[in-house]
Amino acid sequence: MELEVRDFTTEINILDSEKFSVSDEIFKCPFNQALIHQVISTYLTNSRQGTRSQKSRSEVSGSNKKPWRQKGTGRARSGSVKSPIWRSGGVTFAAKPKLYAQKINKKMYRGAIRSILSKLVCDNRLFLVRNLFIKEPKTKLLLEKLRTITSKKSILIFTDFLDKNLLLASRNVHKIEVRTATHIDPVSLINFNVTLIADNVIKKIEKQLV
């Protein structure tokens, strides 16, 4: 299949843009919602640190002596200052460090990314861009260039390398992120409304996802 290539350095009209041949195996796959859900759930689970730790009543520092006698004081009975119902007491069912990591094979992971990319192409939310750089690290300049391609404000940009000017210009803009083609992941692809890919890295992405 062929995709239009936009030029980042000029305000070129879509009708005048060039065509770029891309792999049908990567950008024309059927949408597999079940696979995408499974891969994203695993990806998010693996990003959990699992380091939270709370103290149970047996671990809290304090005396084990009964605060007052069982009967005769008129107060509610109590057996320990470390009771979970007391202030500064232990936690009931205290959380402990836990490993949340799950495994998912490469074939499924790549398949999910191919499915997402194909859906983006189908929805006209993925664009190939030539000369994806700016001459000065100016946010205003970057936004002007992006407006010639899309009116959306949530944009994910993939380049061959992290251009310093592009990175600095996008750093203080909410929902605009610049990455290299080697850092493509399913969660980012669905979190942004539009994805821009430099035309010189499209073959590298195809090679990763075959």
UniProtKB/Swiss-Prot annotation:
InterPro entries: Ribosomal_uL4, Ribosomal_uL4-like, Ribosomal_uL4_dom_sf
Keyword vocabulary terms for this entry: Ribonucleoprotein, Ribosomal protein, RNA-binding, rRNA-binding
GO molecular function per UniProt: rRNA binding; structural constituent of ribosome
Keyword rRNA-binding carried by entry: yes
SUPFAM superfamilies: Ribosomal protein L4
Biological-process GO terms, alphabetical: translation
Recorded superkingdom: Bacteria
Gene Ontology CC: ribonucleoprotein complex; ribosome
Assembly and binders: Part of the 50S ribosomal subunit.
Family, similarity comment: Belongs to the universal ribosomal protein uL4 family.
Name of the protein: Large ribosomal subunit protein uL4
Organism in which the protein naturally occurs: Blochmanniella pennsylvanica (strain BPEN)
